Amino acid sequence: MEGCVAQSKWLAYCRLMRIDKPIGSLLLLWPTYWALWLAGGTAPGGKLLLVFTCGVFFMRAAGCVINDFADRHFDGHVKRTCQRPLPCGALSEREAKALFVLLVGLSFALVLTLNAMTIWLSVAALTLAWLYPFIKRFSHLPQVILGMAFGWSIPMAYAAVGESLPLSCWLLFAANICWTVAYDTQYAMVDRDDDLRIGIKSTAILFGRYDRLVIGLLQLATLLLLLWVGDLNQLQGAYYWGVLLAAVLFVYQQQLITRRARTSCFRAFMNNNYVGLILFLGILLAL
């Protein structure tokens, strides 16, 4: 019996960290890899690659924990989230806070192996990760904060590789914010009816019937900023093929969300993993 309880507790911790749903980690990983390769113009060293890869998974898990802690009184009223570990009682609030501290501690231990500039930037990363879950109580733009949080690994990567933050770094950061707001709005469209009922704010609610238009404009801005990054870094043809394929996927996503059906909006959101991967492969082949 004790073994079953321990196993259930372990599974609850895994679910709280979204180990069973790696899409969030991947959407955070691809921009990190874009920056690591672009910052040095070549493949990063093994140490940097290991530190940033592990850091992505630790901080994404920490972000999920603090998000669920912040939403613990709301998730039970939403169909998609009512079975999460905190609202269903599989884990206590104290256990969630302890896990958050552990994950942040592991992430900071990794950052301490890097230079001082990267360490200072990591403080902002933690602030953004903590701020995002609470912003949706007061603003319809939590997706913008999420975009900054998901993209903060970009200036950190540039700092770790070259101890500088050139224009291409901030253009890539801006592109990632536009992309993140676009795909997380698709994600928020899944929960829009529930969020309206319980008073949670999101860009999906803010944009209303113009949601598809705004998502399209954000996707266009993402592509234009990526083209600018390619020009500044004098990247070869493979990169631009990657941007073109990303544009094709954006068109496909627009088709998916036409009727705003929950399952189709979620499929559009999930499709963004391929966008990130294709762009990374384009960078890889262009350098």
From Swiss-Prot:
Predominant place of localization: membrane
The reaction(s) this protein catalyses: all-trans-octaprenyl diphosphate + 4-hydroxybenzoate = 4-hydroxy-3-(all-trans-octaprenyl)benzoate + diphosphate
Assigned keywords, A-Z: Cell inner membrane, Cell membrane, Magnesium, Membrane, Transferase, Transmembrane, Transmembrane helix, Ubiquinone biosynthesis
Pathway: Cofactor biosynthesis; ubiquinone biosynthesis
Species the sequence originates in: Edwardsiella ictaluri (strain 93-146)
GO terms, biological process: ubiquinone biosynthetic process
Domain of life: Bacteria
Bilayer topology: Multi-pass membrane protein
Enzyme Commission number(s): 2.5.1.39
Top EC class of this enzyme: transferase
Gene that specifies this protein: ubiA
Name under which the protein is recorded: 4-hydroxybenzoate octaprenyltransferase
